[in-house]
């Protein structure tokens, strides 16, 4: 009997799985993540640059994505404890929503837009100031008011005398349509930033849950590798005993020893992958540096019954926070266009002051001044025309981005439906493959124990079971990730991720 070259195939399968998981995670984050910076405005992207949310960025360099994406980082809270932290999926999501860097930056962006809103309102609200002054003056009447003929009793130079003046000043815009439209535009930008913050929370849930599921998958890999190592150890001991009894050849002992060493190596790699994936999860949820933890939530296979595709699309268009955010940006751009056109309109403002003036504080008396100012723009050097061109460009760009996002949502929902159908079938097939591979291994071990065959058949059966376990773990991870992706695609990730994972 000729031994099949199973080792290169196993190494290729393990490497392919690692590459697939890495690409899935990177592409998931890149496709789902909206650009965090400039989310409250309509910032242009220069030709040749790649934004954080583009698939090209993720494919170019996954490590760069991990270093630069704010959703993969977090602000550590508290100090690490010596005891292991029990971390459930709900706890991980809660920590992520509080400490994830993407959410914190998005919250700061809302505060920034609220500040811009107040700046825009300041052009419409009253501006009230007060001032007090005191000075000593000496006046040359001849030089100041042009008295050339001496006046009896009036000296040519008066003073020195003091002047004390304290008063309040009021400046109020009565009519300025440009400022009104810009204030309304800033209000739309605040709403856009608030929706962007909600969208950031959705993305945080996807990132945290995906990383938590990866920890579960890696932990399952460790358990599978440990079981396979123990099985290989039993085979090695059994083969060694049979050789001592003269029932097995030396090559059978070597073959079982090679298999045992391979399983030891795979266990080492699996434990290392689990430890590194825990670090990724800890960073995303803001755990203190060096904090050890154990996951406590088990996510088993639960079939998900979904609504129809048309219903899911309608829910997405009405629920997605990023779609609402961009809709508000379109509205803001429309108001900016109106504001640019309003620069041609006249403006009316009122100014007034009231105070007390005199040579000193004791001899003051009240005075008041009031005036109205009407400004009629005639020619402003082409500035109004330029502002209108800029506003037109921003409005066109915002509308194009909204239509593109609508098409992107349609594609995303359809993709998740396809992924759910495909991965559900994968899980079913993988479960059957594990069952058959387990039976095959048991029968091969029985045949070897009975002396019907050598241990080549047992080694091959162990390889088949290892492949089947790897496939099942990967398919279950992809299926659960597809559930969370569907919740995100519809706009319910934060509120319904747990229900989707439970198949409800």
Pin down the residues of each PLM region:
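Bacterial Sec-pathway N-terminal export signals of envelope proteins
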Residues: 40-133, 139, 289, 296-330, ...
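Small/polar, glycine/serine/threonine/aspartate-rich low-complexity segments that form flexible
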Residues: 45-48, 74-85, 131-172, 295-309, ...
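Periplasmic alpha-helical coiled-coil/stalk elements that build and connect Gram-negative outer-membrane
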Residues: 201-315, 419, 423, 464-466
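Short segments within alpha-helical structural elements
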Residues: 122, 233, 262-287, 434-492
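Acidic, low-complexity, intrinsically disordered peripheral segments
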Residues: 2-26, 36-58, 138, 289, ...
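A glycine-/polar-enriched beta->alpha junction
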Residues: 94-104, 111-127, 160, 167-185, ...
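Transmembrane beta-barrel architecture of outer-membrane proteins
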Residues: 88, 112, 163-167, 210, ...
């Amino acid at each position: 009997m000729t031994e099949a070259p199973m080792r290169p195939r196993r190494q290729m399968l393990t490497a392919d799985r690692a590459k697939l998981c890495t690409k899935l995670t990177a592409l998931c984050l890149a496709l789902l993540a909206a650009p965090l910076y400039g989310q409250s405005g309509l910032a242009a992207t220069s030709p040749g640059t790649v934004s954080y949310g583009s698939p090209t960025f993720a494919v170019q360099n996954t490590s760069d994505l991990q270093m630069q994406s704010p959703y993969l980082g977090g602000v550590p809270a508290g100090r690490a404890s010596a005891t292991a932290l029990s971390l459930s999926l709900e706890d991980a999501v809660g920590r992520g929503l509080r400490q994830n860097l993407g959410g914190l930056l998005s919250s700061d962006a809302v505060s920034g837009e609220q500040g811009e809103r107040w700046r825009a309102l300041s052009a419409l609200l009253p501006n009230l100031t007060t001032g007090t002054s005191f000075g000593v003056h000496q006046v040359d009447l001849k030089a100041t008011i042009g008295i050339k003929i001496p006046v009896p009793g009036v000296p040519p130079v008066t003073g020195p005398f003091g002047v004390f003046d304290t008063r309040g000043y009021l400046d109020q815009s009565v009519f300025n349509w440009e400022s009104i439209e810009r204030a309304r535009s800033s209000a739309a930008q605040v709403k856009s930033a608030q929706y962007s913050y909600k969208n950031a929370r959705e993305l945080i849930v996807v990132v945290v849950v995906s990383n938590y599921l990866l920890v579960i998958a890696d932990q399952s890999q460790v358990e599978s590798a440990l079981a396979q190592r123990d099985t290989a150890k039993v085979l090695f001991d059994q083969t060694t005993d049979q050789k001592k009894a003269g029932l097995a050849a030396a090559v059978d002992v070597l073959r079982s020893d090679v298999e045992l060493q391979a399983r030891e190596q795979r266990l080492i790699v699996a434990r290392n992958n689990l430890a590194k994936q825990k670090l990724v999860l800890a960073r995303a949820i803001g755990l203190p540096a060096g904090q050890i933890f154990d996951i406590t939530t088990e996510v088993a296979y639960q079939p998900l019954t979904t609504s129809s595709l048309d219903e899911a699309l309608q829910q997405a268009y009405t629920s997605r926070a990023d779609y609402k955010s961009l809709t508000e940006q379109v509205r803001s751009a429309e108001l900016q266009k109106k504001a640019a056109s309003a620069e041609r309109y006249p403006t009316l403002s009122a100014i007034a002051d009231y105070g007390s003036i005199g040579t000193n504080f004791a001899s003051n008396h009240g005075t008041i001044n009031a005036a109205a100012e009407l400004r009629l723009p005639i020619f402003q050097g082409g500035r109004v025309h330029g502002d209108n061109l800029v506003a037109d460009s921003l409005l066109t760009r915002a509308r194009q981005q909204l239509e593109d996002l609508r098409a992107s949502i349609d594609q995303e929902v359809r993709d998740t439906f396809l992924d759910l159908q495909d991965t559900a079938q994968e899980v079913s097939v993988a479960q059957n493959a594990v069952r058959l591979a387990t039976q095959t291994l048991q029968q091969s071990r029985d045949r070897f124990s009975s002396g019907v065959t050598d241990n080549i058949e047992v080694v091959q059966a162990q390889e088949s079971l290892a492949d089947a376990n790897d496939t099942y773990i990967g398919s279950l991870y992809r299926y659960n990730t597809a559930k969370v992706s569907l919740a995100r695609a519809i706009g319910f990730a934060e509120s319904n991720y747990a229900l989707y994972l439970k198949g409800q």
